[in-house]
Design a protein with these regions (language model features):
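Short, surface-exposed, charged amphipathic helix/loop patches that serve as local interaction elements
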Residues: 25-170
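Short, intrinsically disordered N-terminal pre-domain segments
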Residues: 1-13
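Ser/Thr- (and often Asn-) enriched beta-sheet segments in non-cytosolic proteins
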Residues: 12-18, 51-53
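Charged, composition-biased interaction segments
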Residues: 19-23
Length: 170
């Protein structure tokens, strides 16, 4: 059979985030870990590393998160611009500078929508931090902001992976 089906959305895993000072890894190790979820792909993970427990989301839970975030009112122009934006930093900066005010607004609206989707996914998936019951509100208290954004992005990457591929991954 060519199609793969997730057998259950009742899966949960413990993960760490790579901005944790108790986690040491290279960019390549970080990328491998985010793809696999296997702690062995990271360089060094100390016992003091913060562990996050997340559960897989069913297709309907993922869709509900998108709807709550505003899927039906998001900017389609912003979505198209987001998809078509260049990947290089300087090239993207010049491209963004050349956008009209309406296009910049549409792109900003779409980026805000994506942030809301990520927050809703974490709200529905995060169950524990360090073995204690947790919520997305605790993630929003992480400082500095760069770490908070990294934690959200990495949680979402793991949530999407286990929700779509199961714990074993690819």
């Amino acid at each position: 059979m060519a199609l793969t089906f997730l057998t259950s959305a009742d899966l949960s895993i413990d993960i760490v985030v790579t901005c944790d000072k108790s986690v040491e890894c290279s960019d390549e190790q970080r990328s491998a870990y985010l793809s696999s979820g296997d702690l062995n792909d990271l360089g060094e993970v100390k016992e003091s590393a913060t562990r996050f427990t997340i559960k897989a989301l069913s297709p309907s839970e993922r869709e509900e998160a998108e709807v709550r975030a505003g899927a039906y009112s998001r900017s389609e122009l912003g979505r198209i611009l987001w998809v078509e934006s260049p990947s290089g930093t300087q090239e993207k900066a010049r491209w963004h500078h050349a956008l009209t005010d309406d296009e910049r607004t549409a792109m900003a609206d779409y980026q805000a929508y994506l942030s809301r989707v990520y927050a809703e996914m974490v709200r529905n998936s995060l169950t524990h931090i360090g073995g204690e019951p947790a919520s997305v509100d605790q993630i929003n208290l992480i400082r500095p902001d760069g770490h908070r954004l990294t934690v959200m992005a990495e949680l979402v990457a793991h949530i999407q992976r286990i929700s779509l591929l199961g714990i074993e991954g690819k």
